[in-house]
């Protein structure tokens, strides 16, 4: 299994302009596969028993210009199309979409908005501050068992304001 994972991850090497960035990509993927919680970069560091000094290096990796998320996404889509047993009905693949609202404590975090909760549970507040995530995946498998392989996930609303903060700098 490790050899298959290594071969799969090697397909992403051309997506990175620096060898070190690719090494951090492999580290992050391994951390995502093994982590026991969803606390971000600290989960990866803790579950892989990395030095606490790696925290800043991982943060830098996510802001690096040595890779482009669109190139990685297209490589992932290509690998799924070539290797995965895409489940089809009448020669058409099945796409699955969903959305979730994730509460955030920070009001001034990028992309955080006031969100209406559509719930019939009266113990939940009517509004929360958080992110609205949307995801789409493709159905993979055979008649005996199927699962959804993720294609893309992003914040659905609230980032337009963030992009306006990045005004050009005049010297």
Residue ranges of each PLM-predicted region?
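Conserved, well-structured functional cores that handle cations and Mg-NTP chemistry
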Residues: 1-171
